[in-house]
Amino acid sequence: ENLNALASDIVFIKNIDNVSQNHIADIVKYKKLIGGILFHLQQLIFGYLNDLEREDVTDEKIRVIKEFAQMELHLVLPNDFERYKNAFQINYLFEELNRPIRVCGMVKNEGEPGGGPFWVKNEEGKVSLQIVETSQIDLANEQQAQIVNNATHFNPVDLVCGLKNYKGEKFDLMQFVDQNTGFIVSKNTEGQPYKAYELPGLWNGAMANWITVFVEVPLVTFNPVKTINDLLKPAHQP
C-alpha cells in the first residue's frame, strides 16, 4: 500500500540493514546497472504493447513479441499457445506484458538466512519467477528442502521497480498481489516464542503478478547487519 501511494515512475528498494559507508562507488554502479536494465526493458515492452493495440498486427510481429516474452522476460506461455487464433494470442500477450516490472539484483548464495529466486507454480498451474522466503517453504518436504539447499543465489533485496504503464499511467499495484501467499512464521519476543501469520510480503506475494527479471550483482553490494557482530565486518568500518 505504501508503494502504491507513490507517484514516482521508478522506485529503488533496498533493505535498511544492508547499508554500508564503504564500496559506495560499486554500489552506485550496480544500482545504475539494474536501473538501466529496467529502463531498457520498459522501452521494449511499451513499444510492443503499442504494436499489439494496432489493428494490423502481423503474424511476424506476434512471433517476435512472443519470443521476447519467453527469452528476455522468461514468461512461461501455455503449451498450446500456437493453436489459438491471433486474437487470443494478442490479448494474452497484452495482458502478460501490461504489468508493473521489477528488476531484482541477486547475489551468490553464501549461506545467509533469507529468500532467493525460484521458479514457482501457483494453484492454477502457472509457472513464474518469484522471490521466495525460506519461511514460505515446507522444509520437511525432502524435495523442497533439496531445492533450497541447491539454490545458487540469494535475495539481498536490491530491487528497482517500474510503477507506470505504457501510457504513463500509474498501475494500481493492489491488482497484482497474490492474496494466497500469506504464511505462518515463528517469532520470539522477550524470550517468548510464538507463531504469527504474515500477509503477502512486499517482494514476494505483493509482487507475485509483476514482470520479474533477476540479475546477478556482486557480493560487494550486499553488506547486511543481522547481528551486532556484523558491524565488525570491513564493510561497516570507517
Model-predicted regions and their roles:
Residues 141-142, 164:
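Long insertion/accessory domains within large nucleic-acid-processing enzymes
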